[in-house]
């Protein structure tokens, strides 16, 4: 153990070395100087040096990093460069302006509308959807167990709450859980997957409960991101895409590889386009990941079984890790469309694929009929993951301790809802059916009304909870937008917000083919408000077109 004086001498030696680097010949007054300046203070005492030498020495040492420059430690210039590349259009400038307008309305500022209609995000409860009764009953019981003695709650809700609480430390949902998630919840998730996929086995040890699906997606991308230059990981994402993917890829320093969905064929996925995209990317990175969103966000398409088989074959042939974002798996509306999980199709294709293709699939409490976005519940299942990598995954999630316990509890209710014969089953089924039926009607309504507007073309909303119509913009509008440094559809959507109070997300925030323009809107508002919004949008588009023609 060095004495304090020895440490001071050692530190001063480093300062002397910094000075020597700046001045080849060290003056005698430096070498013979005594006593030593105080080095325990962040501000070195150079008062004993002649003024010129003191100023010069501090400047040189600051340049060499021995003394920090004055001012902020963290600035835009010194922050993580990857963070500056992150963009998330769903909560971008238009949404920020919508929040300002809401404040202005509350302050009495006159607008040509009375409210802001936020159709920019898939937040069902914010749009007025009522929570599922059974879910909220159990969550109330879990968060305030004294209610277990209240006869207002049905017995199946009480039994479910007791089971969850017994799996929590101290019988409290406020306790930390195991990092991979509450054991009984992971077991229920595995059973749900087996039922969904026709009996194909699911191992609870392959289930990781997550803070929404987003957390799981980012975690898997972290594992996959590696290399530099030509070896840097490339991640294939659909265009249009959900901005979580492009934002995460930018933050992690991976390479975004775009493949385009076919708008003329209801946003279908063509294997030839995947091949084109892959071959082009291999010239500048190492493509390792293929991301699929099914049903689609923002485009609302539902992939056929044949398409999924083709994608799996492509991934196997090109040695790609598959990520299947399946958070809208209950949101299928169009006749002839059906949700097929990637895992089910993978295993039904036989051991040639089921033993080889690496797959991570994701689900959430935020979408489908539940709409419980704020609880941040979700899970991921990993298939064919290398055992050593899986150990690293478990380590990685352990760093964050655990997902929110209430979100885990809600995920349990989603995968294990009231069963036939239980007191809450009938009400649960009525509420679930009502939500999904209303969404199906609104999907059709949105398509029908938008397609009556000259200059707007909307593909069928087969699933999920968004439409992504194409808009034709006059050249004058495009020129004015570019003069303002805005994407033309951003210009359009900002005008729409200011004149009507309707908040949409421009297609440029999701990616689109050059020369095309779109916007994404959710179908979640109540039917009467959705009709009002669509008609206001129709009138605005006609005015906008006339104004700039």
Curated annotation (Swiss-Prot):
Whether Nucleotide-binding counts among this entry's keywords is: no
Tell me its EC number(s), please.
2.6.1.2
| Catalytic reaction list | L-alanine + 2-oxoglutarate = pyruvate + L-glutamate
Give the residue range of the signal peptide.
Answer: none
Please tell me which top-level EC class this enzyme sits in. Answer: transferase
Molecular function GO labels: L-alanine:2-oxoglutarate aminotransferase activity; pyridoxal phosphate binding
User: How is this protein organized at the quaternary level?
Assistant: Homodimer.
> Mind telling me what this protein is named?
Alanine aminotransferase 2-like
Species of origin reads Danio rerio
This protein's gene is called: gpt2l
């Amino acid at each position: 153990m060095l004495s304090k004086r020895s440490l001071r001498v050692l530190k001063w030696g480093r300062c002397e070395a910094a000075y020597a680097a700046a001045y080849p010949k060290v003056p005698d007054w430096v070498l013979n100087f005594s006593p030593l300046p105080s080095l325990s203070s962040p501000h070195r005492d150079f008062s004993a040096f002649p003024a010129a030498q003191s100023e010069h020495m501090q400047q040189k040492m600051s340049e060499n990093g021995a003394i920090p420059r004055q001012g902020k430690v963290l600035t835009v210039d010194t922050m993580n460069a990857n963070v500056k590349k992150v963009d998330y259009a769903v909560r971008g400038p238009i949404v920020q302006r919508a929040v300002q307008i809401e404040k202005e309305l509350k302050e009495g500022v006159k607008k040509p509308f009375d409210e802001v209609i936020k159709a920019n995000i898939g937040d069902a409860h914010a749009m007025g959807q009522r929570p599922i009764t059974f879910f909220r009953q159990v969550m109330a019981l879990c968060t305030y167990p004294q209610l277990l003695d209240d006869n207002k709650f049905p017995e199946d809700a009480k039994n479910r709450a007791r089971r969850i609480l017994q799996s929590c430390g101290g019988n409290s949902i406020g306790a930390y859980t195991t990092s991979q998630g509450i054991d009984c919840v992971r077991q229920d998730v595995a059973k749900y997957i087996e039922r969904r996929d026709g009996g194909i086995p699911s191992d609870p040890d392959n289930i990781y409960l997550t803070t929404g699906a987003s957390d799981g997606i980012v975690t898997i991308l972290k594992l996959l991101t590696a290399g530099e230059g030509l070896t840097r990981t490339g991640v294939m994402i659909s265009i249009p895409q959900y901005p979580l993917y492009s934002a995460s890829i930018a933050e992690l320093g991976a390479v975004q590889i775009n493949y385009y969905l076919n708008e003329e064929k209801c946003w279908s996925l063509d294997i030839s386009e995947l091949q084109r995209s892959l071959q082009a990317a291999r010239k500048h990175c190492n493509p390792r990941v293929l991301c699929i969103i099914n049903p689609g966000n923002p485009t609302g398409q539902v992939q056929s079984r044949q398409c999924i088989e083709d994608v799996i074959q492509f991934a196997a042939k090109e040695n790609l890790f598959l990520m299947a974002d399946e958070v809208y798996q209950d949101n299928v509306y169009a006749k002839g469309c059906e949700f097929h999980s990637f895992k089910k199709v993978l295993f039904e294709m036989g051991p040639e694929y089921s033993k080889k293709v690496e797959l991570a699939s994701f689900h959430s409490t935020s979408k489908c009929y539940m709409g419980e976005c704020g609880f941040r519940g979700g899970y991921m299942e990993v298939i064919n993951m290398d055992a050593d990598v899986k150990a690293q995954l478990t380590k990685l999630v352990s760093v964050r301790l655990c997902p929110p316990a209430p979100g885990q509890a809600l995920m349990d209710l989603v995968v294990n809802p009231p069963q036939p014969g239980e007191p809450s089953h009938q009400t649960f089924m009525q509420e679930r059916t009502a939500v999904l039926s209303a969404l199906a009607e609104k999907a059709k309504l949105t398509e029908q009304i938008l397609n009556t507007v000259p200059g707007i073309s909307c593909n069928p909303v087969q699933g999920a909870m968004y439409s992504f119509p194409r808009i034709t913009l006059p050249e004058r509008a495009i020129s004015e937008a570019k003069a303002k440094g805005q994407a033309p559809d951003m210009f359009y959507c900002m005008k729409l917000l200011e004149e009507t109070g309707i908040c949409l997300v421009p297609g440029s925030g999701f990616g689109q083919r050059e020369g095309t323009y779109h916007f994404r809107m959710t179908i979640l508002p109540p039917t009467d408000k959705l009709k009002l919004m669509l008609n206001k949008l129709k009138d605005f588009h006609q005015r906008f077109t006339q104004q700039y023609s």
